[in-house]
Amino acid sequence: MDKNRFFRAIPKVDTLIEQCDSAGLFDRYGREITVDCIRERTEALREFIGKSEDETEIIRRTESLLPDIASAAEKLFSPNLNPVVNATGTVLHTNLGRALISRKHAEHLMAIVSGYSNLEYDLEAGARGERYSHFEKLLCRITGAEAAMAVNNNAAAVMLTLSALCRGGEVPVSRGELVEIGGKFRVPDVMAQSGAIMVDLGTTNKTHLSDYEDAINENTAALLKVHTSNFRVVGFTESVSVAELVELGNKHGLPVIEDIGSGVLIDLSKYGLTYEPTVQESIRAGAAIVCFSGDKLLGGPQAGIIVGRRDYIKKIKKHPLTRAFRIDKFTAAALELTLQEYLSEENAIRNIPVLRMLTQPPMEIRERAEKLAAMLKNVNARVEVVDCESQVGGGSMPLERLRSSAVAIKPNGMTTAAFEEALRRAERPVICRVQEDRALMDMRTVQPGETELIAAEVAGILGVK
């Protein structure tokens, strides 16, 4: 194939500038941005011609160069972070933003982020206040801790705690708890950055209380326990409880710090889920500091929450890294509103989207799946309701499988892969999972009002019979 003729067919930049100006692109996007897009898209076309052997596609792309330039310019002015429909069945989907904030709080949150607020202003005293004041009392009431604060994520919470309380000192931790928390970030790395000296002990599957006792010396600053929330070791295993560590710590005058991970504030085993230790249990057991995530099983915004003894929290608040890790006004507001729901367990289960999705009765999910299937009965595909399993996600309850129902769609005249891609590229992207060459819409994670949206997108892509 003679590719030179295709390269020669690419319009000159000056010609494209004139065409874009005539098409009104300069008026809409400005000359500088339009010219940048011209250069970017012509270079992309050259690269494609150099690699491709598909003459038809080369001609199509060359003929659509002007619309392609306009699309590239428009994309610069359009939001890239957009809402999607989560039909994967993974409740805490890390790639899709993890926990949802309740829509009932949207108006208040919009008022906070779009206007001034009393973020660090004491309205009663008429003086500077503290941003933790909006949720600290709630955290203390719910968990039983003496004091509380929050930073931007749980890795920061652990690092800040260790840096403030243990820098330069040794911190024994079980080898079986040296987890990787995602994105190749690991507990040993976080500890190293904090300035604490990690002392790993025990083995992957077994750690005894005597291992901790043997590791304690005059340089020991604290004892660390990390809840392995994103994996399980089963079989010939043994670990040391928080209560046992606290007893040992008290004997040697050492605080116990626990990274409990997912931040469970309600015993979810009452609702048919796998038991996960709660923050309250750790505080009652005597842990000096407990760190956990805000956007996992707690069901709030991304945050690293630190609760525990007043003297330790006071010291952490004064650490220089606290400002580097501090939360913004949106997080403070969303955390307060989420925690208020926990003042009543019934309200929390009903109003916090994560908890509501996790505790949905299977029959309710089935009914919603049947509703969507009925709406799709005339589309050009084979559609049926199937039983499936959802998962918690977000590194929480890794062994938990939740009974659910999905709408399985096998398109006619289109591959399932092409259909899944079309759903992803829709105006309101629909993210599903592909199983046995069918697109599955797991209704557990489909939110109110989204069923109709899915039906419209599917019909638009597949057409009707």
Regions found by a protein language model. Name each.
Residues 80-81, 148, 292, 428-433:
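A short linear hydrophobic-aromatic micro-motif
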Residues 125-342, 377, 457:
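Conserved PLP-enzyme active-site core in the AAT-like
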Residues 1-74:
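Long amphipathic alpha-helical segments
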Residues 311, 319-320, 327-378, 386-391, ...:
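Structural motif of enzymes handling amino- and sulfur-group chemistry
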Residues 38, 43, 87-88, 98-124:
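Glycine-rich phosphate-binding segment of PLP-dependent enzymes
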Residues 52-101, 107-108:
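Long amphipathic N-terminal alpha/beta scaffold segment
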Residues 10-11, 29, 85-89, 298-301, ...:
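Short Gly/Ser/Thr- and Asp/Glu-enriched loop/turn motifs at secondary-structure junctions
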Residues 362, 366-449, 453-454:
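Conserved C-terminal alpha-helix-loop-beta "cap" of PLP-dependent enzymes
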